[in-house]
């Protein structure tokens, strides 16, 4: 027996010493350079900061940047727009000066480019203050649209009298009108109808677009066509059918064949390092202008990929290489406008900054018909409303379920699934969907079911699918006290819009509505709101607010930029050196031992990345009386209800924690559950006579960065509460962590957090749990692990 104990002690100590040695050596390791396609959010932020600093240095004393006389205010408006999207607020001195300059410009000499860029800058900065200038520019742009001849619906450089439109001027005019409509300025439906006809007539037989009719397609103009078709369709009021005061949700929706042809064509021609054009097209030199068009086409269409190209990552990779290291500028080819650093840098910043907007939701594309997207503008309008409510730029995507991996789905915190008929998902699609939820994703589904639309097939199929994928978690109605009804603003449950949910991963991770929600969402566009009857406006408002609440509940408003989105544990770092890989399992008990199933793995993954050393993230559950327990230097324990160990388990744990083996236990109460906390304290205190629970003092090494961890003197502790207007929120205090320790003969053997770590590690910030913020939960967990490894 003594020999066996000594052997187990040797195994434990060897495991510890191996990783500690690797940690220390890690200080000396040269950091690898990211490979192509592995661009980081940190590198993008630095590039944006450097480009922003360049533009600020180039600003003239009067607030302008180098202008072109034929486009007064154009360059200044472009630079202002780029800086605003890069994160500078309107109150910033540079922005304030540029806005004053823009307001002072003589607007009697307008051009399409300048008026459009000025409108976009003012709409993004101070639309309330400058609404008169915005309206003036809108009226000018509407009057400048060509209304006769083959170029009808397009724009030229200045007046419609020229009768010669081009697709570049036309796209900028539409961008400006769209931004104005978004801030409440009324725009002419006739203008939008003519613009739609114009773009349909401009499309090449291949699906692409050239600079003018008859030109071969180019990259920049095809992107202009994609964006313009989307903008026009969004602003055409006749696409919203209302009969007898009710929305007709099952009416045929515009499925733009022209748009699909353009996107399919572009998937075969995409390039990030040059503007694909015809052989003699001067547009091939306008690379930064082209990339700004790529960003716009990708974002507005909700596409992460064009063909098999991840357009944002490929574009970022190229732009980071092209940025001048000293000045922070980008400079284009000579003898064109992009040779002016302010112009090229502005286009580059617009690509980098707008392209990294957090993805808040993704449409789940399945099947061969369009039932998955019965109301194609619905999610877009919900995201628009959410942006304004949260004062945060957001975007959405579409994922093809036939091709998507779990990691692809995890790029979005919310996956939206809708339909009318049977889902008919394959075994692989079901497995990926199940893994998405168990890996922390949130599924938001609804049936396209309304007075005029039968969605019983989808409703029946979805319920069966949930029962198949989550047999232990039934789909149940969310009662009036569920936080989802209060997550952003208070919404009363309605029999017209009931919500059902499935509990998984510390929260309700699946929400289902048997009624069509997206139909009402698409009616939230300002152009439609003006035409809706009062009762219908209220219905739309309630449906939109419910959608915002679901997004708020699912994300906690804690959204990450594209390149910051999580990946599931993969074999790269953790499995490349199996002989030195540390394995740390989780203890089994009857109090919800695996309810937050991903929390421990996420912490191990974060620690592995922080140390740049291999720690196995393979899920392992082990019983306290398993003979292998002594092989592991550290084990994890959490739960959400009371529990008791058996006499055999108590003896095994006492042996594990003894001075002979010196095992270490890390524990937390899931969602701050008090029953579990009470059980844990009692069960462990009874294991070894003389052991004692005490709060770990703030000056303990575990609370410091001594072991290559973090200073924990101030962390964010969050407590759920309701605001005065009955909105679910939380009270956040800055404090030192409340951690309890079990000391055995003067040695710290168990560290326990009575406040939640697990749900924060699994799903991020929660509206339901008393616990630490997601960032601080990770830091606390890493510190505890590092301390345990040193002991």
Task: Name each model feature, range by range.
Residues 1-15:
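N-terminal secretory signal peptides that target proteins for export/translocation
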Residues 16-32:
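Bacterial N-terminal signal peptides
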Residues 37-50, 64-94, 107-139, 143-193, ...:
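An alpha-helical repeat/solenoid feature that recognizes helix-turn-helix modules
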Residues 81, 119-120, 174-175, 227, ...:
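Structural recognition of the beta-strand scaffold that forms the well-ordered cores
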Residues 94, 378-464, 468-469, 513-514, ...:
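Helical hinge/lid and interdomain linker segments adjacent to catalytic or ligand-binding clefts
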Residues 106-110, 124-127, 147-148, 161-164, ...:
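Solvent-exposed loop/turn segments at secondary-structure junctions
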Residues 354-414, 418-422, 517-518, 525-634, ...:
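Aromatic-Pro/Gly-enriched surface loop or interdomain linker
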Residues 450-549, 578-583, 673-763, 773, ...:
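An acidic, glycine-rich "communication" segment
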């Amino acid at each position: 027996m003594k020999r066996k104990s000594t052997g187990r002690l040797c195994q434990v100590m060897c495991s510890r010493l191996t990783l500690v040695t690797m940690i220390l050596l890690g200080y000396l390791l040269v950091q690898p350079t990211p490979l192509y396609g592995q661009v980081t959010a940190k590198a993008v932020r630095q590039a944006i900061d450097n480009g922003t600093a360049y533009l600020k240095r180039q600003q003239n004393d009067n607030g302008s940047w180098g202008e072109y006389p034929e486009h007064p205010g154009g360059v200044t408006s472009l630079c202002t727009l780029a800086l605003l999207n890069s994160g500078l607020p309107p109150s910033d001195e540079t922005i304030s000066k540029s806005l004053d300059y823009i307001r002072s410009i003589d607007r009697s000499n307008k051009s399409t480019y300048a008026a459009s860029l000025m409108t976009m800058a003012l709409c993004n900065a101070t639309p309330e203050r400058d609404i008169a200038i915005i309206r003036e520019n809108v009226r000018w742009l509407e009057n400048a649209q060509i209304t006769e001849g083959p170029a009808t619906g397009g724009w030229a450089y200045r007046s419609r009298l020229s009768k010669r439109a081009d697709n570049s001027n036309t796209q900028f005019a539409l961008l400006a009108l769209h931004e104005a409509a978004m801030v409440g300025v009324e725009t002419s439906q006739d203008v939008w109808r003519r613009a739609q006809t114009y773009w349909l007539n401009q499309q090449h037989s291949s699906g692409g677009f050239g600079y003018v009719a008859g030109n071969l397609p180019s990259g920049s103009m095809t992107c202009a066509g994609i964006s313009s078709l989307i903008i026009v369709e969004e602003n055409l009021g006749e696409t919203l059918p209302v009969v007898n005061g009710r929305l007709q949700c099952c009416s045929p929706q515009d499925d733009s064949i022209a748009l699909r042809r353009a996107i399919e064509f572009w998937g075969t021609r995409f390039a990030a390092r040059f503007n694909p054009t015809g052989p003699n097209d001067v547009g091939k030199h306008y690379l930064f202008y082209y990339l700004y068009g790529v960003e716009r086409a990708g974002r507005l269409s909700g596409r992460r990929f064009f063909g098999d190209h991840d357009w944002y990552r490929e574009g970022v990779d190229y732009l980071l290489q092209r940025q001048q290291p000293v000045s922070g500028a980008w400079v284009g080819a000579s003898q064109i406008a992009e040779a002016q650093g302010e112009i090229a840098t502005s286009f580059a910043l617009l690509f980098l900054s707008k392209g990294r907007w957090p993805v808040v939701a993704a449409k789940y594309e399945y099947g061969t018909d369009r039932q998955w997207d019965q109301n194609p503008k619905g999610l877009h309008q919900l995201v628009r409303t959410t942006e304004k409510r949260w004062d945060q730029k957001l975007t959405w995507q579409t994922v093809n379920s036939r091709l998507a991996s779990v990691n692809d789905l995890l790029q979005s915190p919310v996956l939206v699934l809708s339909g009318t008929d049977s889902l008919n998902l394959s075994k692989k699609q079901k497995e990926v969907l199940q893994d998405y939820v168990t890996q922390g994703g949130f599924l938001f589904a609804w049936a396209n079911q309304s007075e005029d639309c039968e969605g019983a097939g989808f409703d029946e199929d979805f319920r069966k699918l949930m029962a198949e994928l989550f047999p232990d978690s039934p789909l149940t109605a969310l009662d009036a006290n569920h936080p989802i009804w209060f997550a952003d603003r208070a919404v009363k449950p309605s029999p017209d819009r009931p919500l059902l949910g499935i509990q998984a991963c510390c929260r309700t991770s699946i929400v289902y509505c048997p009624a069509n929600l997206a139909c009402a969402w698409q009616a939230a566009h300002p152009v439609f709101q003006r035409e809706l009857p009062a009762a219908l406006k209220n219905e739309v408002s309630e449906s939109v607010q419910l959608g915002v609440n679901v997004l708020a509940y699912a994300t906690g408003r804690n959204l990450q930029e594209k390149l910051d989105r999580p990946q599931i544990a993969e074999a790269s770092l953790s499995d490349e050196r199996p002989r030195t890989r540390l394995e740390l399992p989780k203890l089994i008990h009857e109090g919800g031992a695996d309810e937050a199933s991903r929390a421990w793995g996420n912490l191990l993954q974060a620690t592995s990345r922080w140390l740049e050393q291999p720690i196995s993230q393979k899920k392992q559950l082990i019983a306290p009386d398993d003979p292998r327990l002594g092989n592991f230097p550290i084990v994890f324990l959490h739960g959400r209800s009371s529990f008791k160990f058996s006499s055999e388990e108590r003896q095994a744990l006492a042996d594990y924690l003894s001075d002979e083996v010196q095992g270490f236990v890390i524990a937390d109460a899931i969602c701050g559950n008090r029953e579990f906390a009470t059980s844990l304290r009692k069960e462990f205190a009874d294991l070894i006579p003389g052991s004692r629970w005490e709060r770990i003092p703030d000056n303990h090494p575990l609370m410091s960065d001594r072991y290559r961890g973090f200073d924990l003197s101030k962390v964010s502790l969050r407590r759920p509460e309701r605001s005065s207007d009955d909105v679910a929120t939380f009270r956040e205090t800055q404090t030192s962590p409340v951690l309890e320790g079990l000391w055995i003969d003067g040695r710290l053997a168990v560290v326990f957090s009575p406040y939640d770590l697990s749900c924060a590690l699994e799903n991020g910030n929660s509206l339901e749990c008393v616990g630490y913020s997601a960032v601080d939960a990770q830091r606390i967990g890493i510190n505890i692990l590092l301390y345990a490894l040193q002991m």
